[in-house]
Amino acid sequence: MNSRLQEIRERQKLRRQLLAQQLGAENADSIGAVLNSKDDQREIAETRETCRASYDTSAPNAKRKYPDEGEADEEEIEEYKDEVELQQDEENLPYEEEIYKDSSTFLKGTQSLNPHNDYCQHFVDTGHRPQNFIRDVGLADRFEEYPKLRELIRLKDELISKSNTPPMYLQADLEAFDIRELKSKFDVILLEPPLEEYYRETGITANEKCWTWDDIMKLEIEEIAAPRSFVFLWCGSGEGLDLGRVCLRKWGYRRCEDICWIKTNKNNPGKTKTLDPKAVFQRTKEHCLMGIKGTVRRSTDGDFIHANVDIDLIITEEPEIGNIEKPVEIFHIIEHFCLGRRRLHLFGRDSTIRPGWLTVGPTLTNSNFNAETYSSYFTAPNSHLTGCTEEIERLRPKSPPPKSKSDRGGGAPRGGGRGGTSAGRGERGRERNRTNFRGERGGFRGGRGGTHRGGFPTR
């Protein structure tokens, strides 16, 4: 409790220092000298009311009509002339811009001067993004309060490290390279193309060729995808959200999830130094679209996927300007979710070479890939799967068993009718209505406390 109170006090002290710097005060204790007092605020409010009243009477739609001849006396005509002269004098006055010395005008709520949890206003005042205050975002402390999940992650990491193939990498220009020469089908394909958007936002000249979405769409991903597989495509935060879906459809995948990378600025608070000319707001997140191919149900295909282990959010510190590398946590999410061992990373770099993955990219400085050696790791039956231990199976989140009508106290299943339950329309209807993996509840953990979305939407 004392440490928590101390942390709150330190944050309050930091905020006061930042406010003093922005308001031009000598120190945090002298902020009150530059802010409006209650009397000043009351005077400002009265002045506003007076201005509004005068504007209401002097507005163009509130102008009095010139009195008709014969219907008005001389006194009304004189009043009309005085009003016209007053309006002309006000129009000739120089415009004075009102200077706001504090944020009381923009406070959240109308009955209180306390901004409470108005993180958006706090960002305006201090430059700290709202996502800076989300707790337990790191891999080390995320499951600190959930011992079962922490143990599950530990066991899965051990199993993955034991079943990983040696890291392989291939330096190749993907624009000219025929990816069918890899001579393998992959369970997971991760694409990290160097989009023009990344360099357009930073204003830095690209040190590698930028790919357009037309170029990305020409990649023959469908030729190397296993019958049931997943693709993860980093698509930025602009036009790629729509064009990325087009790519997934072209490759034979259905979009089933959107993993968001939320960027914090705890170490360097302030406004974004660069802004995409096509953007209206400052963009502080990126998206990774996830596609599914084939039929995969989380309730029956536990040999291939383990759902609800991770969340669909990645929250890390924003990298330096010009650094377009993605957080390493995306690899953990993929490895925890899909039990397939044949993993391919396209547009990889030397820094992303990883056990259990085949990394292909134009910026790699070396190659050790051999198609026959790589295929030899998966010759035995089911050798393309990591497998699962009894302890992991016991700890991992599972889908609740489906409830039938008899379980709820009903009678025979619908469609039993003539010919018995097996011949009725109900059984065929249930078979027809069985959805694939995306139709069932979430692929990733929906997040505790309602912070995150709960999985794959239905079509």
Swiss-Prot record:
Protein name, UniProt field: N(6)-adenosine-methyltransferase non-catalytic subunit METTL14
Subunit structure: Heterodimer; heterodimerizes with METTL3 to form an antiparallel heterodimer that constitutes an active methyltransferase. Component of the WMM complex, a N6-methyltransferase complex composed of a catalytic subcomplex, named MAC, and of an associated subcomplex, named MACOM. The MAC subcomplex is composed of METTL3 and METTL14.
Any single biological process term in GO: mRNA modification
Function as written in the Swiss-Prot or TrEMBL entry: The METTL3-METTL14 heterodimer forms a N6-methyltransferase complex that methylates adenosine residues at the N(6) position of some mRNAs and regulates the circadian clock, differentiation of embryonic stem cells and cortical neurogenesis. In the heterodimer formed with METTL3, METTL14 constitutes the RNA-binding scaffold that recognizes the substrate rather than the catalytic core. N6-methyladenosine (m6A), which takes place at the 5'-[AG]GAC-3' consensus sites of some mRNAs, plays a role in mRNA stability and processing.
Composition skew (Basic and acidic residues), residue ranges: 425-443
Biased composition (Gly residues): 409-423, 444-453
Keyword Nucleus appears in the UniProt entry: yes
Subcellular location: Nucleus
A single cellular component GO annotation: RNA N6-methyladenosine methyltransferase complex
Site entry (Interaction with METTL3), positions: 146, 242, 245, 298, 399
Native source organism of the sequence: Gallus gallus
Region (Disordered) residue spans: 50-73, 392-459
This protein's UniProt keywords: Differentiation, Nucleus, RNA-binding, Spermatogenesis
Region (Interaction with METTL3): 135-136, 237-238, 255-258, 278-287, 308-312
UniProt-annotated stretches for the region Positively charged region required for RNA-binding: 245-254, 297-298
GO molecular function: mRNA binding; mRNA m(6)A methyltransferase activity
Annotated family: Belongs to the MT-A70-like family.
